[in-house]
Amino acid sequence: MAFDGFITKSIIEELKPHLIGGKINKVFEPTKNDIVLSIYSNGNNYTLALSSNPETCRIGLTTYSKPNPQVAPNFCMLLRKYLIGSKIIDISTMDLERTVQIKFEAYNELNDLVIRKLFVEIMSRQSNIILTNENNIIIDTLKHVESGTRELLPAHEFEFTAINKESFLKLNSFDEFYNTFNSSDEKTLSKIMPSQL
């Protein structure tokens, strides 16, 4: 199943009541593209799978368990350091973007309350998982990216990859929707939704 903006937003809305307020117990990296978070929330244990696999990128709850490497990769160790014991305080997307933000709070070694964010980009070959501080400064990423158009590296600011389309969620009336539809080169709803909205 392809993860477009509609599906991503729908899944996030389903995850919220189960996971917000939950605490991270364990973190695994079973493959180079996958992160698994074990979460205790509302008296239940949940397993949240985050995948940056270009062909099967996704986010969602799972009961399927993959074998984990005997030695945890570096990014997994970093996530364990910063996230185990943290509480999930929000899960969100921006409109119909395919970037999911999971916000955590935890106490550091000085007993100060700190906020961290885990961004999951569900975008085929550009899929990635990024850990930042409260100000969106990257702590580390599953995949380092250094290109002319975008850099995803530690100490850099994380910037959303926005789709330059008008979100139908921002349209205030049927007339606005009709005008957007009517001004498009596409004349069928199935084509205009992905291309213009």
Task: Briefly describe each language-model feature range.
Residues 6-67, 71:
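A structured, charge-rich N-terminal accessory region that forms the first stable segment of a protein
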Residues 43-197:
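Phosphate/anion-contacting hairpin/loop surfaces
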